[in-house]
UniProtKB/Swiss-Prot annotation:
Cellular compartments annotated: Mitochondrion membrane; Mitochondrion inner membrane
Membrane topology classification: Multi-pass membrane protein
Organism (species): Mus musculus (Mouse)
Protein name: HIG1 domain family member 1A, mitochondrial
Sites bearing N-acetylserine, chain numbering: S2
Length: 95
């Protein structure tokens, strides 16, 4: 039984930074969704001190819903953008 140790796959050759940059160019709304999620969570944690009479669980639920809503919105915009590019901006010729 022989083992082939010199497999060279392009996905294993690129580093984490270059892989993230390549993926960000392919799907630009994913990093936007990640950044928005992080920003909403950071803002929610910052406002945790001055939440007033609101229970902590309610505040955290509102923060989670806002962050998830932002991510779903970014995903929807990303799908719309990719559909626009594939079907309207650069349509493939019919055979």
């Amino acid at each position: 039984m022989s083992t082939n140790t010199d497999l060279s796959l392009s996905s294993y050759d690129e580093g984490q930074g270059s892989k993230f940059i390549r993926k960000a160019k392919e799907t630009p709304f994913v990093p936007i969704g990640m950044a928005g999620f992080a920003a909403i969570v950071a803002y929610g944690l910052y406002k945790l001190k001055s939440r007033g009479n609101t229970k902590m669980s309610i505040h955290l639920i509102h923060m989670r819903v806002a962050a998830q809503g932002f991510v779903v919105g970014a995903m929807t915009l990303g799908m719309g953008y990719s559909m626009y590019q594939e079907f309207w901006a650069n349509p493939k010729p019919k055979p």
